[in-house]
Amino acid sequence: MAKEKFVRAKTHMNVGTIGHIDHGKTTLTAAITKALSYKGGADFTPFDMIDKAPEEKARGITINVSHVEYQTDKRHYAHIDCPGHADYIKNMITGAAQMDGAILVVAATDGVMPQTREHVLLARQVNVPALVVFINKVDMVDDEELIDLVEMEVRDLLNSYEFPGDEVPVIRGSALKALEEDNPDGPWTQKIYELMDAVDSYFPDPVREIDKPFLMPIEDIFSITGRGTVVTGRIERGVVHTGDQVEIIGLSYETKKTVVTGVEMFRKILDEGEAGDNVGCLLRGIEKDEVKRGQVLAAPGSITPHKKFKAEVYVLKKEEGGRHTPFTKGYRPQFYIRTADVTGTLVEFSSGAEMVMPGDNINMTVELIYPVALEEGMRFAIREGGRTVGAGVVTEIIE
């Protein structure tokens, strides 16, 4: 029989488990793979396989992340699980493994704990579109009313961080019991199916990069005699066609308008370039010295230049190659935002703290010396003297 070819018929989505340490995130991840393996939608991945998370590098930061995959009738999922609390923070801030939706795991025995709060806050800051809740370890709580209280507490927490806490699906179960059950029709395994039904129906389909408005960070600029100026870069999102109107944004508040008169890839002329392509765009009526690395080429009106913003930042420890000493307000490092490398000042820390230690994560206000194309949810690196000292995500634009 001919080998079956991979058909991309289902929507692909990135999800993950979040929540306090020892509340059962990894056990639940294993239980999902086991439950779906009965239906042929996954290979069962045991707990200790997931717990040995391999190291990954993102923006110079080492993060331990486990990836498993599984599918339901509706979607194909890539699921991430991190062994340590610090790994979650680093992952969410750097966007190393992006989440289109997250499963918040809360132990019925404990209720909402400090990391539960921190993960929900981070999910809000980095714009995770939707959460569902799994109240775990309900087999260890005899009084149903206690579980009701935990559910109310979780819904209140979600509301306080602007998630729709009253409508978020909350499923009660036991990941460990589901793993021990070995029966696709068992009551605990049914709870896992119930959770996956909620994930299928409640998480909205992610917007693909190619369907978003066109944006390309400018890496290099060339002048071609008789033809004009070419800017090169990797298209971050959307599609660009020959003849499209675009804007050149950043480095000043003035936005230049131009038309793409040609798109080239590997020295061949194309009709269009799309997200992920490394291309050169020929621009009408633009001189070589009017464009700089660090600006972006974008669909008109889709992004604007800004200097001042709030960001959630993870400060690297010295073992990660970061600073050995804390820094205070007024610190002026370099901010690497897409292809721009711009000096900025830390105006203030939201917590009212006076200084930040290596290994901390903190929300801060930053003011750049000149404007760059900025939007909420955008990632950046902070560097000083040639080394990365922090990684951040824009949470709010001020001006």
Curated annotation (Swiss-Prot):
Q: Where is this region: G1?
A: 19-26
Q: Where in the cell is it found?
A: Cytoplasm
Tell me which PROSITE patterns the record gives: G_TR_1, G_TR_2
Q: Which CDD domains match?
A: EF_Tu (cd01884), EFTU_II (cd03697), EFTU_III (cd03707)
Quaternary structure and partners: Monomer.
Name of the protein described by the UniProt record = Elongation factor Tu
Note down the stretches annotated as region G5: 174-176
